[in-house]
Regions:
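Active-site cores of enzymes that catalyze phosphoryl transfer or operate on phosphate-rich substrates
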Residues: 1, 79, 211-270
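Conserved DEDDh/DEDDy metal-dependent 3′-5′ exonuclease domain
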Residues: 1-91
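Conserved alpha/beta enzyme-core scaffolds, especially Rossmann-like or related mixed alpha/beta domains
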Residues: 7-15, 71-84, 99-108, 271-272, ...
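Cytochrome P450 catalytic domain signature, combining two hallmark sequence patches
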Residues: 37-43, 92-98, 185-196
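Extended catalytic-interface subdomain
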Residues: 65-130
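DNA-dependent DNA polymerase catalytic subunits
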Residues: 104-193, 242, 246, 250, ...
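Conserved phosphoryl-transfer catalytic core
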Residues: 194-207, 211-212
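Gly-rich Lys/Arg/Thr-decorated short loops/hinges at beta-loop-alpha junctions or inter-strand turns
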Residues: 264-283
Length: 584
């Protein structure tokens, strides 16, 4: 009754909810029907609320679940939890997408950016008198096996030089693939078109018409121009300006449209998609990155890493943006594509594989910029299944290292990092970590009946199903690691777990793994951390400073004793009665 009165009094244009699609609005409508109390969610009284069913689909190697939807008439309803990428660009980003795609506000909030790009392409086609196909019917052109191997290569990825590096600049191509489509006129109808102005695609032997602008470049060019304009405005606005948040949200919405447009170019069901155009874009991208590498090396820089649309370069004596500006200018000259300096790292660490430390991993690194901020990729803090307490500890270790005043002071920050780790170890052992911080989550990749050996997420979902809570394929399940069978306790069960059943060893393992990712570049391996924590051994100095078989002399002990005592001194923390107590 109160909600109905509020809606009539204020008559809002927009209802912004969390879980409104899947829970609150369906529940309120159900109560309204059962009790006979009208609930005017719609402005148009003669229309019924539109319900759209939930669905599960497979995309990019993972199963995704989209909850049911509640659409209103006369006013908009957006569910922040069920809206696509709402956490990235918020309400301002949704408004910007609606302006760009001409899709209804409630629709554009819930569909993927790919659907937005498809709508923009159809608008371009209608404006230019091009018929829009109902379904894609154009098949891929026949290829020999050699042609397929040559064309189907994707982006260029180098193996980075592992370890710590100082004064490294990260140079990125601005919206590389969309820029390639616009600059080289890559579109389904221009690829393979024999015209006097056609140009040859590197490596592929395919030609692209350059005389008449294609449908895809016509769609993307205004979007690219608008995003660059927002970027330029953001660079001139002070941090306190309220417009920064709005411009950033709109720019992020543009970014997702531009990121998706490349994938849609090769999507089998895209109306204006064509695999040959997709392959041409990646070929141009590989050529551009190689030219960028050659430009940097010709100017005396060392290329530490290259990854699809960016490269990391270093040169003795180069530490300021003016030192790297000649590289940017030369890359623009040689490629014809826009580039920008993502930032200059005081130091950056490229990490090796966990399976074989001799092998580098392309997208597993972390570094600290000159302004003190940091960037992480491929480590535990970026994974959605990592407990929040582990994430906080890993970021605290990184902040500890980031406090070094210079590259040479990094080893001196190691005792403080070990102290943080030991304090976290003791907090876990003594039951001082809130259960909320230990919750892990994983996606349910199959229906429960399809598992031959249930995963951890499946075991937690089975527990929930026994109390009537059904988890669908593609949804995430939250749980705690416990000892014994079944090894997990579903977090959404009504009864909390017995504190003595928490699997401390599993969380200790996760803790050491996360700490190892940060401390490994300083020479500390996981076995060393294991020994330090389990045996309560002290820290004497950076690993490698003392040969394994060399005896510890009295002078060495005296020089390292302050560091040892500092690392072994845990911070005092009062126990709390509302937190669990470890059983062992």
């Amino acid at each position: 009754v109160n909600l109905g009165a509020i809606l009539k009094r204020h008559d809002p244009d927009l209802l912004l909810t969390m879980w409104g699609d899947t829970w609150s609005l369906p529940y309120l409508l159900k109560l309204s029907k059962e009790w006979g109390i009208p609930l005017p969610l719609n402005r148009e009284s003669g229309r019924q609320v539109l319900h759209r069913p939930e669905r599960t689909y497979f995309t990019y190697g993972q199963v995704v679940h989209r909850g049911r939807q509640v659409h209103l008439f006369g006013r908009a309803h957006i569910d922040g939890h069920n809206a696509m990428l709402f956490h990235d660009y918020g309400l301002e980003g949704v408004f910007e997408l609606a302006r760009l795609t001409s899709l209804p506000l409630q629709t554009v909030a819930r569909v993927s950016p790919g659907s937005g790009i498809s709508a923009m392409q159809m608008l371009t086609a209608l404006r230019t008198g091009v018929l829009v196909p109902w379904h894609k019917q154009q098949a891929e052109r026949p290829k020999t096996a050699l042609d397929l191997l040559r064309a189907d290569q994707g982006g260029l990825v180098y193996q980075p030089i592992t370890g710590l590096h100082r004064d490294v600049a990260e140079i990125d191509f601005i919206s590389m693939y969309p820029s390639i489509m616009a600059h080289f006129n890559v579109s389904p109808e221009t690829v393979g078109a024999e015209r006097p102005t056609a140009e040859l695609v590197p490596e592929l032997g395919v030609i692209i018409e350059q005389e008449q602008s294609g449908l895809v470049p016509q769609t993307l060019q205004p979007l690219l121009d608008k995003r660059i304009a927002f970027k330029e405005r953001l660079m001139t606005l002070p941090d306190w300006d309220p417009r920064r948040k709005v411009y950033q949200a709109r720019s992020t919405a543009h970014k997702w449209l531009l990121v998706t447009c490349f994938g849609y170019l090769g999507y089998k069901n895209a109306r204006f998609g064509r695999i040959e155009a997709h392959e041409a874009v990646t070929a141009y991208g590989r050529e551009a990155l190689l030219r960028a590498k050659e430009a940097a090396e010709d100017l005396g820089f060392t290329v530490l890493h290259m990854y699809v649309d960016g490269l990391w370069v270093q040169k003795d004596g180069a530490s300021d943006i003016t030192d790297f500006q000649p590289v940017l200018d030369e890359i623009i000259t040689r490629t014809g594509l826009p580039v920008a300096m993502d930032g200059i790292y005081s130091w950056i660490a490229f990490l090796p594989s966990r399976v074989d430390a001799r092998l580098p991993v392309a997208n597993r690194y972390f570094g600290v910029y000159k302004d003190g901020s940091h960037k992480i990729r491929g480590i535990e803090a970026r994974r959605r299944d990592t407990p929040s307490w582990i994430v906080e500890l890993q970021l605290a270790l990184l902040d500890q290292l980031a406090g070094a005043q210079s590259f040479g002071e990094l080893p001196n920050r190691l005792p403080g990092a070990v102290s943080l780790l030991r304090q976290a170890w003791l907090d876990l052992k003594r039951g001082r970590v809130p259960l909320e911080g230990l919750v892990a989550s994983q996606r349910l990749s199959k229906e429960l009946g399809d598992y031959q050996v249930p995963s951890l997420a499946a075991r937690a979902a089975i527990q929930l199903s026994k109390i009537g809570k059904q988890v669908k394929q593609g949804q995430r399940v939250r749980f705690l690691y416990t000892r014994g069978d079944p090894g997990v306790h579903a977090w959404d069960l009504p009864d909390p777990p017995n504190p003595t059943t928490i699997d401390l060893r599993q969380y200790q393992k996760l803790l050491l793994r996360a700490a190892n990712s940060i401390l490994q570049p300083l020479g500390v391996d996981e076995n060393t951390l294991h020994d330090w924590m389990y045996s309560n051994a002290g820290y004497f100095g950076p690993p490698g400073s003392l040969p394994p078989n060399q005896p510890i002399t009295l002078s060495y002990w005296r020089s390292r004793l302050p560091l040892f005592l500092k690392a072994c001194r845990p911070q005092k923390a009062a126990p709390r009665a509302d937190l669990y107590r470890a059983g062992d």
